[in-house]
Amino acid sequence: MSNAADKLVIAGREFSSRLMVGTGKYASNEQMIKALEVSGAEIITVAVRRVNLADRGKGCLLDFIDPKKYTLLPNTAGCYTADDAVRTCRLAREAGMSDLVKLEVLGDEKTLFPDNEELLKAAKILVKEGFTVLPYTSDDPIVCKKLEDIGCAAVMPLGAPIGSGLGIRNPYNILIIKETVKVPVIVDAGVGTASDAAIAMELGIDGVLMNTGIAGARDPIAMAEAMNMAVRAGRLAYLAGRIPKKLYATASSPIEGMIG
């Protein structure tokens, strides 16, 4: 099965790429745009707090992102309460940004772990108001199931703390989450290099979202290309089906007809 025939579907929308990327931490907007292009990503996330919605047309970040080429995913990065996150999503919608939102409600500044209690509260409100909610959450299958039951269009468990580059720290929880929910599972945060992205996709999840892993690399453009390849390779490997792990060797050549 080729990657071209294998689509990511979120709330009825089809995407060819299973890689989603952020727009922060780049050296320049020009570098960001080039990285987006080579990443092959179709969904681009933007922190609403970083965008001066009143300055459209005056060098605003959104002026550099082609809405015909990318699906914009506004996020609530920097929000620590449900009320703040809901207010941020409402402002984004009023400014003409997408109803498709990445919901973040953080618990503290040191770990940037999600506050699941506030997250669930915000998700309930936003779903009722017609938003398509993609929540950043902990790698807790119970919380992910609750988010699905609320009506979230996907769940986005962390692979490791935001910006840590530690990779997928608890693959077994990610596997359980994938078994538990029917909505897409997108690993968000912690991916540090291409092998991390490939490992995530080999678990059978539906996609990966990253920012620092690309923007923080020594060469963000090259890393964006590497992540593009890694996500596609990991997905294809999952679909192909890996061989089982065994303690002892198995000969790869037939033993029939051996001399002696």
Swiss-Prot record:
Entry annotation: catalytic residues: K102
UniProt entry tagged with the keyword Disulfide bond: no
One GO MF term attached to the UniProt entry: thiazole synthase activity
EC number: 2.8.1.10
Keywords: Cytoplasm, Schiff base, Thiamine biosynthesis, Transferase
Location relative to the cell: Cytoplasm
Chain sites annotated for binding 1-deoxy-D-xylulose 5-phosphate: G163, A189, G190, N211, T212
Gene3D superfamilies: Aldolase class I
Homology family: Belongs to the ThiG family.
Protein name (Swiss-Prot/TrEMBL): Thiazole synthase
Organism annotation: Geobacter sulfurreducens (strain ATCC 51573 / DSM 12127 / PCA)
